[in-house]
Amino acid sequence: MKKIFFNSSLPRSGSTLLQNILGQNPEFYVTPTSGVLELLYAARSNYTSSPEFKAQDFETMKSGFLSFCLGGLESFFDEVTDKPYVMDKSRGWGIHYGFLNSFYPNPKIVSMVRDPRSIFASMEKNFRKNQFMDSGMVNHSELVGTTTEKRIDIWSQSQPVGMAMERMYQMFREGINEKIHFIKYEDLMKNPAHEMNKLYKYLEVEPFKHDFNDIEQITHEDDSVYGIYGDHKIRKKIQQLPDDSKSVLGTHGYNWIKQNYSWFFDEFKYY
């Protein structure tokens, strides 16, 4: 029986890198951005709204549906890989912990997090380097999205950053965070072997000796699907780069992010 684990991380926080590090372990099948949760989520919507299910015994139908979800999840990965461990990557697993836990008890979820100022700076840098495309967020005649500060405000209230941060906030309010293994991107850069050993301990899997100087990218996806922010390419070598978030965002934007997400800075001890 395969063990399925779940990667539910913040955007621009190293989740693709983590997948490809794990992919060095021959025991692991790792996904790019996965749609498996979407299959289950759609099934839940149909199960909830279909009169055919409503008209039958509630407990019997509930039991059947949860078994359907478990069977679908396990059968999907039984078909695509013969490896004993799977790490499925989708940002939604964390906030939908209750749903997942209802048919896959006590799921193990890992979440990459990062200083929000670096996340927003990464978004802004992608915006600036893709000027040959229309970002869809700038309207000069209406003065929308025309400055870094305005773009920070837009990203904080929309996908992917705003939604991810709001979900993270709610996960802490519900206590879901206590069931998740968090890895700070900055810690992974500083001491990758230590962080990976902690992850293996959480997953209850035998540790593997990784090569952090030669990480082959084995997950591939068409980044054009995600627009100018769909950058899922990784560097072959783990190395800590200088923090340029303040120079990219400017002092006002840099300070606004820290104030607006003070709870995050407190929880994860960012300063």
Go through the PLM ranges and name each one:
Residues 63-79, 121-202, 253-255, 261-263:
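PAPS-dependent sulfotransferase catalytic domain
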Residues 89, 100-126:
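Conserved phosphate-donor/acceptor-positioning beta-strand/loop module used by diverse small-molecule
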Residues 14-28, 100-104, 182-207:
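PAPS/PAP-binding and catalytic site of the sulfotransferase fold
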Residues 1-72, 80, 128, 218, ...:
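PAPS-dependent sulfotransferase catalytic core
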Residues 16-19, 37-40, 94-96, 117-122, ...:
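Short catalytic/ligand-binding loop motif for oxyanion handling, primarily in non-cytosolic enzymes
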Residues 5, 29, 108-110, 181-183:
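Hydrophobic/aromatic beta-strand patches that form the interior of the parallel beta-sheet core
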Residues 1-5, 154-157, 165, 169-174, ...:
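PAPS-dependent sulfotransferases, especially Golgi type II membrane carbohydrate sulfotransferases
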Residues 69-96:
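Glycine-rich phosphate-binding loop used to anchor ATP phosphates in small-molecule kinases
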